[in-house]
């Protein structure tokens, strides 16, 4: 009856030998997909909606205070937004010198897809905006002008959650709304 005892000893030795072949367990590295909780589509959509409304508000005669929190955007997004403000201000001044200005707008963002890869996310969405104008000749108009613009927003995970890194049109060329500065 030494045979079953012999098999048990061989199995134990084999188990110990194979255990030595396993890689050492390490904690996940910062930025790996294991350390970043995935964003919800509604969380990203809310950030996009606020960012697009902030951007569109820059064309108004009296722009509202931006509502997107600093912790919700990367330094790269903040930098581009600051550069874009100067371009929009020049366009707005030219528009006003011709006797026109925007008085209000209404924007709806519809998320079409969300892709998450580790600490980065990409959101394809469509913006539908109606803008109301006024002119020195006719006063305020009750008929809006409008546009629909497909865009992509990118996000990066950070210690503060998911931060907006960029928003760009997915179709290039053509005439863009005054608030959208490409490049």
Task: Give the positions of each predicted feature.
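C-terminal motif of bacterial Sec signal peptides marking the signal peptidase cleavage site
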Residues: 17-20
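Surface-exposed, charged secondary-structure patches
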Residues: 90-138
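Core segments of small alpha/beta cavity-forming domains
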Residues: 32-104
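Bacterial N-terminal signal peptides that target proteins for export
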Residues: 1-9
């Amino acid at each position: 009856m030494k045979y079953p005892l012999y098999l048990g000893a061989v199995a134990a030795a084999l188990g110990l030998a194979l255990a030595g072949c396993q890689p050492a367990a390490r904690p996940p590295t910062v930025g790996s997909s294991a350390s970043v909780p995935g964003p919800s589509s509604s969380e990203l959509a809310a950030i996009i909606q606020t960012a697009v409304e902030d951007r569109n508000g820059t064309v108004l005669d009296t722009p509202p205070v931006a509502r997107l929190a600093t912790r919700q955007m990367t330094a790269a997004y903040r930098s581009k937004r600051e550069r874009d403000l100067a371009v929009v201000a020049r366009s707005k001044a030219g528009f006003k010198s011709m006797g026109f200005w925007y008085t209000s707008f209404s924007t709806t963002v519809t998320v079409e897809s969300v892709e998450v890869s580790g600490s980065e996310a990409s959101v394809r969405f469509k913006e539908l905006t109606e803008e109301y104008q006024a002119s020195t000749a006719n006063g305020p108009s009750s008929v809006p002008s409008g546009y629909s613009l497909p865009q992509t927003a990118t996000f990066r995970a950070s210690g503060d959650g998911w931060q907006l890194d960029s928003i760009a049109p997915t179709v290039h060329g053509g005439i863009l709304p005054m608030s959208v500065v490409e490049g």
